[in-house]
Amino acid sequence: MFKNYCCVVLFAFTGFYCGAQNINPDLLANRWDAHWIQVPNTPARDYGIYLFRKTVNLAAKPAKMIVHVSGDNRYKLFINGTLVSLGPARNDLYYWNYETLDIAGFLTSGKNTIAAIVWNDGDVRPEGQISNRTGFLLQADDKSNDILNTSDSWKCTQENSYAPIMGIGYSAYYVAGPGEYRDMHKSLQNWMGNDYDDSKWQNASNIGWSGATPKGIGDISGWMMVPSTLPQMELKPQRFATVRQSEGILLPTSFPAVKTALTIPAHTQVSFLLDQGFLTNAYPELSFSKGNNATIALTYAEALFEEKPDGPGKEFRKGNRNEVEGKIISGRRDS
């Protein structure tokens, strides 16, 4: 058996986004000391998930610590295990965005870990995602903090627990990228935390001989760097509103509006249909334990189909989106 918690969760990155006015002028006019980095001996443009870590010791908690961060395709940045940035905002290679943020509030005196996960969807990336190749970049705003700059001093590894899930269950023009399959047996746990042992990880390798280059200075690295003009997207917790259908399980009346433990016996298959009641953009978060070799599958859809949209002659009718009885869900999936 395993326990499972399900909700839609967004986290607010408020209070530390800095914007272009906090960028050292030297970084707008000169080549950076930080290099784009990669995991050695991994494909440059194929699908892949990569982890990067840097451990530093600080004599005291800083009052300010501004950094500029980017990745290709995208990254999540963690400070001492806390997610602090998600980016970069999409653009093209002639205007490749970097995010500017003050990470001082997440640092402490003594040991600190800066960590990032970077993913490249390769040939199955969304149509709107321009890409040069897989890479990660972090540049300290002040030269006194250049120990943070990405270089071959960073540790790295490939995360092999991920794979893309193609398609949305029926034939249609779909170019929004793949779903995500995760094998938790292969997953690296707590890799972004201070206590994680990365002694067996490789040192990163620099991409090319030059540091990153701001737009107008050169395009040696392949990305012409510009400061993002958009603040980080607002992210805040948002739970699902109601359960519309369920099979194989009697759900507590408090679920899903209130965080509730669900115990699912071994060798049992259950399903339930969650309805938010309004359009939302969100990242689902699941908390679960036990259930070795169990499978969890999530399917997302704006509305249900009146019949399974899987063959010739099907009209893909949806009807009233508030009606669910006798209908079929088909859409993008994670598992």
Question: Can you describe what each PLM-predicted range is?
Answer:
Residues M1-P25:
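Bacterial Sec-dependent N-terminal signal peptides
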